[in-house]
Regions:
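Conserved beta-strand signature within the Rossmann-like core of class I S-adenosyl-L-methionine
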Residues: 125, 151-155, 171-192
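Conserved Class I S-adenosyl-L-methionine
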Residues: 199-221
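Core SAM-dependent methyltransferase catalytic element
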Residues: 238, 245-271
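Short SAM/SAH-binding signature in class I
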Residues: 145-159
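A short, conserved alpha-helix within the catalytic core of class I
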Residues: 132-137, 161-174
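Short "lid" loop at the C-terminus of a central beta-strand within the Rossmann-like core
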Residues: 130, 159-161, 190-194
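Short alpha-helix
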Residues: 215-239
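Rossmann-like AdoMet
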Residues: 1-127, 131-145, 262
Length: 271
């Protein structure tokens, strides 16, 4: 997740990465995080399930990429590498798969380094995903990834922090241009396009409830998400609701929640 430059290690201050960990049933969260998460869930009861849909999409898209021969991953705005994250899925299929987690937020980086200690093929890097030139020059990225080979780029829940004034299409192009042909980019995004009126009100109340923890959340429709994949070939079924993107036995989570309609997901191939 991308967060404000003022973020710090104060355990009394709710933290976006730890809140997300709490939604996923992880153990790396504190009372302040759980308290804010409870407030957020009170205005959007489907928030926890939405987080689980997002993680389910990440797991399925990583599995898909490994099946296509991808052996190295860049997970942007990753938060904490817990609860069935990229390295766990990739390395279960290919023990030699390499993963670089990137987050700007120092809490996520500090905890992530502890979690990944002892794993020679996974590292945590402190960098801002909105600055790809700096990110790709980071020694942690350069030391782990071979940018001349195809790469799996994970952008699950990242572009929701990038407003139109920050040129999200241009940002996606910057990543696409660095990726070797045969690379894949997975992206998920918050939406209220298919929500009923009551749920739309809840979504915008949730956006307000997150203020003070993050800078801003942005909601996009399907056309807005499709535009982010300009210049790439969308993998079937294209842009779809998160739980509907290529469900796989053992990697799915139940549907039926109002949150089913609150996130789009897609994977694009770099040709």
């Amino acid at each position: 997740m991308l967060v404000s430059e003022t973020a710090h290690l104060d355990p009394e201050t709710p933290n976006i990465s730890r809140i997300y960990d709490y939604y996923l049933g992880g153990a790396f969260n504190l009372p302040a995080d759980r308290e804010r998460a409870t407030v957020i869930k009170s205005v959007l009861p489907g928030m926890e399930m939405l987080a689980r849909f997002n993680r389910g999409f990440l797991r399925r898209s990583v599995a898909f990429m490994v099946d296509q021969g991808i052996t190295q991953f860049l997970d942007l705005g990753s938060g904490l590498p817990t609860a069935g994250n990229t390295h766990e899925v990739a390395q279960a299929r290919d023990p030699h798969a390499k993963v670089v987690y990137v987050d700007y937020e120092p809490v996520a980086v500090a905890l992530g380094e502890q979690i990944l200690r002892g794993n020679p093929n996974a590292v945590m890097v402190e960098a801002d995903a909105r600055r790809p030139d700096e990110l790709f020059g980071h020694p942690g990225v350069r030391g782990m990834l071979d940018l001349d080979r195809p790469l799996g780029v994970m952008m699950t829940g990242v572009m929701v922090f990038v407003g139109d004034h920050e040129d999200p299409v241009g940002l996606m192009k910057a990543y696409r241009d660095v990726c070797a042909p045969g690379s894949y980019i997975a992206l998920s995004h918050l939406t209220d396009e298919r929500a009923d009126p009551e749920t739309k009100v809840q979504v915008h109340a949730m956006v307000e409830a997150y203020k003070g923890v993050i800078e801003q959340l942005y909601v996009r429709d399907r056309a807005g998400v499709e535009a982010l994949f300009d210049g790439m070939t969308l993998v079937e079924p294209g842009v779809t609701l998160m739980p509907e993107w290529n469900p796989r036995p053992g990697l799915d989570i139940p549907t039926g929640s109002p949150a089913h309609h609150l996130g789009y997901a897609a994977v694009g191939r770099v040709d």
